Amino acid sequence: MRREFPQKGVTNLIEGVKVKELKVIPDERGRLMEMLRADDDLFMRFGQIYMTTAYPGVIKGWHYHKKQTDNFVVVKGMMKVVLYDERESSSTRGEVNEFFMGVHNPILLQIPPRVHHGF
């Protein structure tokens, strides 16, 4: 599923990074957005779900996980998520990806183990 994602600044996805465009269904009651299903190509297995917030002007990063794959979705507002690949065995070592995601660009961003990320 590796492909170029049509977003400004992202010309070559970091190896193992996947992007799923999310469909938002609004109506008079609010919005519905399905994020991840067990039959999605991106679904691996269930581990945990957590929610984080960031105050305006605050940056959370740089960090990575040795074994964990992250699935990021921004449900309110907009966030810039930056990825950096320093994995020695990766074909995209040294590559940086930037994603602007949230209510105006609803995507799920899958980040593989050992890829640095911050937002």
Predicted regions and their residues:
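Non-catalytic, conserved peripheral segments adjacent to functional cores
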Residues: 1-105
